[in-house]
Amino acid sequence: MTETAKRPLYVPHAGPSLLEMPLLNKGSAFSTQERIDFNLQGLLPHNIETIEEQTERAYSQYNLCNTDLDRHIFLRSIQDNNETLFFRLLEEHLEEMMPIIYTPTVGQACQEFSKIYRTHRGLFISYPDRERIDDILRSATKNNVKIVVVTDSERILGLGDQGIGGMGIPIGKLSLYTACGGISPAYTLPVVLDVGTNNPDLLNDPMYMGWRHERVSGAQYEEFVDLFIQAIKRRWPNVLLQFEDFAQTNAMPLLERYKDELCCFNDDIQGTAAVAVGTLLAACKAKGEKLSEQTVTFVGAGSAGCGIAEQIIAAMQLEGLDEAQARRRIFMVDRWGLLTDDMSNLLDFQHRLAQKRADLGAWGGQQGDDLALLEVIRNARPTVLIGVSGQRGLFSEEVIRELHSHCKQPLVMPLSNPTSRVEATPQEILNWTDGQALVATGSPFQPVQVGDKRIPIAQCNNAYIFPGIGLGVIAVRANRVTEGMLMAAANALANCSPIVTQGEGAVLPALGDIREVSKRIAVAVAKQAQAEGKALHTSDEVLNDAIEANFWFPRYRAYRRTSF
């Protein structure tokens, strides 16, 4: 416990209003003296409980829920009533509850957002209110915001346009910043930019709570986002802004436009890339190989897939390859087949990842020929297969067996979310490779039994990366998030892998260890920020103390009454 946590907190609120503040409410844990000082006598049952007793009751209530969506709603209701209790409950049951508060259950919660809505959380900034964004930000109840997660809800997981229902993603992401990275919930703010929706189900739903209008696009959209960014810079100039679940047509341009203007990153592009590269590095270390020796095939060439590919290329260059050599080891397969330089429909960020058809030799065919996934596997002979397509079943038995025929221990990463969109299940992949493949998935899966072996499945979850990035940025007050910082995070994650540290187990650490993993990532990120001049340099001792000081634990502090 830090010295700050031991000191009393001076609180100017009292009575029912105090009980209605999730960041301050202790419920039945208010002491006798606090009940007197804060005019709470008679507003709570007589018995005074510890947080351990409250957590036990909450968990027993949680177990009465019948469905995962019911469990999600229950946990969110606790969060909206008592954040300390919510995060204590998560701390004690993180592996069990993480799939409930985030993927895959959060996908359904986003789809049902208007139907299950209970109370406000975060900010809803709609296009019709674009001239009042400064006023909206000033109305936020949190003054010392250090991390904002913002979405426009156009590409929620693999579910597409969910309108304001996408707010479930920033809420869930920030819950993980706290549960996994120790970021105080007092420092976090979820935001949804309501620019309308093109989802006809929502437009025709009488219960839909968002702006009932087709999506704003083009120059109007860009102007609106810029109004938001500039207002954020005025309100919280040192904030870390995370872009979340923007469509690929906007995600990369927004990142490129603002990455040198404020401290920001896109988790779908850069966070996904960092955890994927960390997974690859761990697998390579375990096999005694180099990343630069691998050949990687992607299924899905959107912004997430291309972001991963670019970071792999950068990592290969750090191992000695030149850029051209590294790019020749990356094969991007999309709905039209392998991306090649003679295609006329490539997006801007895809051009640099397209293979030169002339370099493919006989199997490259003629200009205009589509090269399907199986053909790419058969001829490129990859050692790594990554799925970010959102299409169930694309990793067929024929594809996986072909992959295994030339690579004894391939790394297969079906990363699409939610579970219903995964390219292949771990059970299928391991059955088709005689239990030899290394598997990491985007959604959580139970261990797989293959013969007499029980094989744990690593969830290639961005939660291994972004909480540590946030903690490191906050600890040293970094003013930017750089590619070097993301690479430092990936390397730190790889060094925590059980198959690296113990020679067996999953490719990634157990979720139960994620808070310690986040601290190690925070140290690596902070040191890299200092090395690049993005933060003031300190000694290692001062840096470690700063990380510990910023690491919040869900414990109640004693309260003292004060006036405004």
From Swiss-Prot:
Q: Which Pfam families match?
A: malic, Malic_M
Q: Which GO terms describe its cellular component?
A: cytosol
Q: What is its EC number?
A: 1.1.1.38
Cofactor(s) the protein requires to work: Mg(2+); Mn(2+)
Residues that coordinate or bind NAD(+): R155, D268, N417
Question: Which family, according to the similarity comment?
Answer: Belongs to the malic enzymes family.
Q: What is this protein called?
A: NAD-dependent malic enzyme
